[in-house]
Design a protein with these regions (language model features):
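C-terminal motif of bacterial Sec signal peptides marking the signal peptidase cleavage site
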Residues: 15-19
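A short, structured surface patch at a secondary-structure boundary
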Residues: 79-144, 152, 157, 266
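Structured C-terminal subdomain patch of bacterial secreted/periplasmic proteins
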Residues: 133, 184-200, 207, 211, ...
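Bacterial Sec-exported substrate-binding components of ABC uptake systems
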Residues: 20-81, 204-237, 356-402
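Positively charged n-region of N-terminal signal peptides that target proteins for export
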Residues: 1-9
Length: 402
C-alpha cells in the first residue's frame, strides 16, 4: 500500500511539472508575436497635419504637406517651376503646349529649348490634358482640370479673384507661384521654390537650389566687381521674347544678367521698363556706341528675314560691322527658362570680360546648372534644339543670316 501511494505521488508530481513546462513554452512562443505587433504599430505613418500657407500673390491657402498624389500645373511657368522641386511622377495632367506628341496644340516654342520639357517630356507625353496653355491662354480651363482629378493645383495665373474662384470651383487647394522682375535672381523665385518645398515635403531640395543660385550669382558678380567703368564695353541685348514675339528691337534696359555681371548696358538711362521694343531710330542712334551685341536664340527666326530684306539698319551697328555679335540661349519660352537665364549670365560675363572667365567652359557650366535645377545634364539636348543653332557662340554676321 505504501508503495502504491508513493507511486501515485510521484506520478502527480510529474504531471504538475509537465503542466508548468507547457505553460512556460506557451508564454515563450507568444512573446515574439506581441513584439511583432508593436513594431507594426509604431511603423505605421502618422497622419499629416494641415497648415495654412501664403502663396506668392498673398492668398492664404490650407494645405497638407507631403500628402498630395495628383498634381496639375497651369499657366506659363508653373510646370517648369514645379519640375525643379516636385516629383513629376505625381502629375495628373499637363497643358497641351507641354505635350509635344499632340498634333493640335500651340507649337510656337517647339524648336526652342525648354529644359523641363527636354528632361521630362517622356512623362508629359503620357498624361491627359488639363488645358491648352500657351501665351494666349489667359483663363484656366476648369472642366479639363477636373477631368485630371487633381488634389492640388499649382498655378501661374496671378489674379487673386480668379484664383479664389478656381479653388472654389475645383474644391482643392490652388497655389499661385511667381518669379518677379529679376527672374531667377528675384526673391520671388526663391520664395516660390521654398513654397513648393514646404507643400511637397521637399524643403531641403528647395533650399539647396536657392543656395546654388545665390552662390552662382555671387561668384559672377565678385569676378567683375572691380572692373572700372571706363574699361567696360557697351553692350546691347536683343531678341528677348515677350508673349511669343521678338526681334532685334526687343530689348531691356534693366536686363538682370547685365546687372549681375556688372555689364554696361548701352541703353542705360533711357527709362525702358522690363522687356519691350525700342524704335528703329533708337537702334540706329545707339549703333556707334554698341561694342557688343548679345542676341537671344529665340529671335533668330524673326531677325533673319528682316536682315535679308533690308540689311542697312543692322549695318549701322558697330558690333554688327565688327563681328561682335554673340548668341545666348532662349531666355523666354513659355515664360522664363530660369536655368538658362543663369547660364546666359555666365556666357555674357565670359563674352564681355574674357580674362575674368577663362576657366569657364560653357558646356560644363550648362550641365552643372541643369543638374542642379532638373537633376539631369542637358547641354547636349539644349544645344541640339533647332533654335539653339548648336549652342553658345560668336556669330559670323557675314554668313549666319544668309
Amino acid at each position: 500500500m505504501k508503495r502504491m501511494l508513493a507511486f501515485l505521488c510521484a506520478a502527480a508530481l510529474l504531471l504538475m511539472l509537465a503542466a508548468c513546462g507547457t505553460n512556460q513554452a506557451a508564454e515563450t512562443t507568444q512573446a515574439p508575436t506581441t513584439e511583432a505587433t508593436q513594431v507594426e504599430t509604431t511603423a505605421a505613418p502618422t497622419e499629416a497635419a494641415e497648415i495654412t500657407v501664403t502663396d506668392m500673390i498673398g492668398r492664404e491657402v490650407t494645405v497638407t504637406p507631403g500628402s498630395y498624389k495628383s498634381v496639375v500645373c497651369i499657366g506659363a511657368g508653373a510646370l517648369r517651376m514645379y519640375s525643379y522641386i516636385g516629383d513629376v511622377s505625381l502629375l495628373g495632367g499637363v497643358e497641351d503646349i507641354d505635350n509635344t506628341t499632340l498634333e493640335d496644340r500651340p507649337k510656337m516654342f517647339d524648336a526652342v529649348a525648354r529644359p523641363y520639357v527636354l528632361a521630362f517630356g517622356d512623362v508629359f507625353h503620357t498624361l491627359p490634358s488639363c488645358g491648352v496653355g500657351g501665351p494666349q491662354a489667359q483663363t484656366a480651363e476648369a472642366e479639363k482640370i477636373l477631368s485630371c482629378a487633381p488634389d492640388i493645383v499649382i498655378s501661374e495665373y496671378e489674379d487673386v479673384e480668379k484664383e479664389d474662384a478656381l479653388q472654389e470651383q475645383l474644391g482643392v487647394p490652388v497655389i499661385t507661384l511667381k518669379a518677379g522682375p529679376k527672374g531667377v535672381f528675384d526673391d520671388a523665385f526663391s520664395g516660390s521654390m521654398a513654397l513648393l518645398g514646404q507643400i511637397f515635403d521637399r524643403e531641403q531640395k528647395a533650399q539647396t537650389l536657392v543656395d546654388f543660385v545665390k552662390s552662382e550669382a555671387a561668384e559672377i558678380s565678385s569676378r567683375t566687381a572691380k572692373i572700372a567703368d571706363g574699361d567696360k564695353p557697351s553692350v546691347y541685348v536683343c531678341g528677348l521674347g515677350n508673349w511669343g514675339t521678338t526681334n532685334h528691337l526687343m530689348t531691356a534696359e534693366n536686363y538682370v544678367s547685365f546687372q549681375v555681371a556688372n555689364v554696361k548696358n548701352v541703353l542705360s538711362g533711357t527709362g525702358i521698363q522690363g522687356i519691350g521694343p525700342i524704335e528703329a531710330e533708337k537702334f540706329v542712334e545707339i549703333g556707334d556706341s554698341t561694342d557688343i551685341m548679345i542676341m537671344d536664340a529665340a529671335a533668330v527666326k524673326n531677325i533673319k528675314p528682316l536682315y535679308q530684306e533690308d540689311p542697312t539698319m543692322f549695318d549701322t551697328c558697330k558690333a554688327w560691322k565688327n563681328g561682335e555679335v554673340y548668341l545666348e540661349m532662349a531666355y523666354n519660352a513659355y515664360y522664363t527658362n530660369f536655368e538658362i537665364a543663369l547660364i546666359n549670365t555666365w556666357f555674357i560675363a565670359k563674352t564681355v570680360y574674357p580674362e575674368q572667365f577663362q576657366d569657364v567652359d560653357l558646356t560644363a557650366k550648362t550641365n552643372e546648372v541643369t543638374k542642379a535645377f532638373l537633376g539631369q545634364e542637358l547641354a547636349e539636348k539644349i544645344f541640339a534644339c533647332p533654335s539653339s543653332f548648336g549652342g553658345y557662340q560668336k556669330i559670323d554676321t557675314a554668313t549666319f543670316f544668309h
